[in-house]
Swiss-Prot record:
NCBIfam families: efp, PRK00529.1. It comes from Rhizorhabdus wittichii (strain DSM 6014 / CCUG 31198 / JCM 15750 / NBRC 105917 / EY 4224 / RW1). GO terms for biological process: peptide biosynthetic process. Pathway: Protein biosynthesis; polypeptide chain elongation. Keywords: Cytoplasm, Elongation factor, Protein biosynthesis. GO terms for molecular function: translation elongation factor activity. InterPro entries: Elong-fact-P_C, NA-bd_OB-fold, Rib_uL2_dom2, Transl_elong_fac_P/YeiP, Transl_elong_KOW-like, Transl_elong_P/YeiP_cen, Transl_elong_P/YeiP_CS, Transl_elongation_fac_P. HAMAP family: EF_P (MF_00141). Belongs to the elongation factor P family. It comes from the Bacteria. Involved in peptide bond synthesis. Stimulates efficient translation and peptide-bond synthesis on native or reconstituted 70S ribosomes in vitro. Probably functions indirectly by altering the affinity of the ribosome for aminoacyl-tRNA, thus increasing their reactivity as acceptors for peptidyl transferase. The lineage of its organism: Bacteria, Pseudomonadati, Pseudomonadota, Alphaproteobacteria, Sphingomonadales. PANTHER family: ELONGATION FACTOR P (PTHR30053), TRANSLATION ELONGATION FACTOR KOW-LIKE DOMAIN-CONTAINING PROTEIN (PTHR30053:SF14). It holds the Pfam family Elong-fact-P_C. This is Elongation factor P.
Length: 187
């Protein structure tokens, strides 16, 4: 399906110069002279290269539809992650860097959605939010109202997030996987 260059949104998969790219960041610019354009930071889904491209409103690009399948995360071994197709029970091993920073939030038995292009895994989507345990939290400085009231804390998966002062070690919290931010205390 063809779309205008200014209709590209973050997360869209497009075909550009013979490659399959995911739009990562978008910035709409309207200079004083000339027509408006969309500055798009893209990541190649096959080889991981990044590219910044300027699309004018008159340009069109092909939007690619990916197939999605439900998988379950089984285990990690070194830099390899093993998933199981929930329909066929087939196992597939993927490199950890395909998931980027989100790989730290994988938990045994977690359900994920895998995006496939021509039967080849392109990306893995985790749930937007997961539960994690605080293993270390800095002390709160009383009376410090001039600055933000959040403090740094370390999760059980090694990721550091900013949490409210009432959160202490051993507390289970809900974390946004892609923003790596505190959402709320777990129930």
């Amino acid at each position: 399906m063809k779309i205008s260059g200014v209709d590209i949104r973050p997360g869209n998969i497009i075909e550009y110069e013979g490659g399959i790219w995911r739009a990562v960041k978008i910035q709409h610019t309207q200079p004083g002279k000339g027509g408006a354009y969309m500055q798009v930071e893209m990541k190649n889904l096959i080889d991981g290269r990044k590219n910044n491209v300027r699309f004018r409103s008159a340009e069109t690009v092909e939007r690619v539809r990916l197939d999605t399948k439900d998988f379950q995360f089984l285990f990690a071994e070194g830099e390899d992650l093993t998933f199981m197709d929930k329909d066929t029970y087939e196992q597939i091993t993927l490199p950890r860097d395909l998931l980027g920073d989100a790989a730290a939030f994988l938990q045994d038995g977690m359900d994920v959605v895998m995006e496939l292009y021509e039967e080849r895994p392109i990306s893995v989507q985790l749930p937007d939010q997961v539960e994690a345990t605080i293993v270390e939290a800095d002390a709160v400085v009383k009376g410090q109202t001039a600055s933000s009231s959040y403090k740094p804390a370390m999760l059980d998966n090694g990721v550091r997030v900013m949490v409210p002062p009432h959160i202490s070690s051993g507390t289970r919290i809900v974390v946004d996987v892609y923003e790596q931010t505190y959402v709320r205390r777990a129930d």
